[in-house]
Swiss-Prot record:
Domain of life, source organism: Bacteria
GO molecular function, one term: structural constituent of ribosome
One cellular component term from this protein's GO annotations in UniProt: cytosolic large ribosomal subunit
Subunit structure: Part of the 50S ribosomal subunit. Contacts protein L32.
Keyword hit for Transport: no
Origin species: Rickettsia felis (strain ATCC VR-1525 / URRWXCal2) (Rickettsia azadi)
The protein's name: Large ribosomal subunit protein bL17
PANTHER family assigned to the protein according to its UniProt record, in alphabetical order: LARGE RIBOSOMAL SUBUNIT PROTEIN BL17M, RIBOSOMAL PROTEIN L17
Protein family per UniProt: Belongs to the bacterial ribosomal protein bL17 family.
Alphabetized UniProt keyword annotations: Ribonucleoprotein, Ribosomal protein
Gene Ontology biological process terms in this record: translation
Signal peptide interval: none
Length: 126
């Protein structure tokens, strides 16, 4: 029985899953919108939302905690300086998932995950 077991396995090892979520979080912070499979997007959502909630506080302890999760200094700077201030008054729900059909090769469900009040001109700019 799987009682109180959170998260999805995504058919990868735990270290692969942690690295994948960290890399996807960096991509989402950098581009503010990414395209991925629906289960990965659903796993990324609580991961990135906890990071943004921490980044709203913006002190040294938070910076070190976020840096231990995503390992990219430029993404951490953007997360704390830009996204933390952008969502300072929002109590949660910083991302949205938009279903985008199915992938041609294997019919995997595809989705976009993006920030709610995203800057459309921020594609790839840190």
């Amino acid at each position: 029985m799987r009682h109180k077991i959170k998260g999805r396995k995504l058919n990868v090892t735990s270290s692969h899953r942690q690295a994948m979520l960290a890399n996807m979080a960096v991509a989402l912070v950098t581009h503010e919108q990414i395209k991925t499979t629906l289960p990965k997007a659903k796993e990324l959502r609580p991961y990135i939302e906890t990071l943004i909630t921490k980044a709203k506080k913006a002190d040294l302890t938070v910076r070190r905690s976020v840096l231990s999760k995503i390992k990219d200094k430029k993404a951490v700077e953007k997360l704390i300086n830009i996204l933390g201030t952008r969502y300072k008054d929002r109590p949660g729900g910083y991302t949205r998932i938009i279903k985008a059909g199915f992938r041609y090769g294997d019919l995997a469900p595809i989705a976009y995950i993006e920030f709610v009040d995203r800057d459309i001109n921020a594609k790839g700019n840190i």
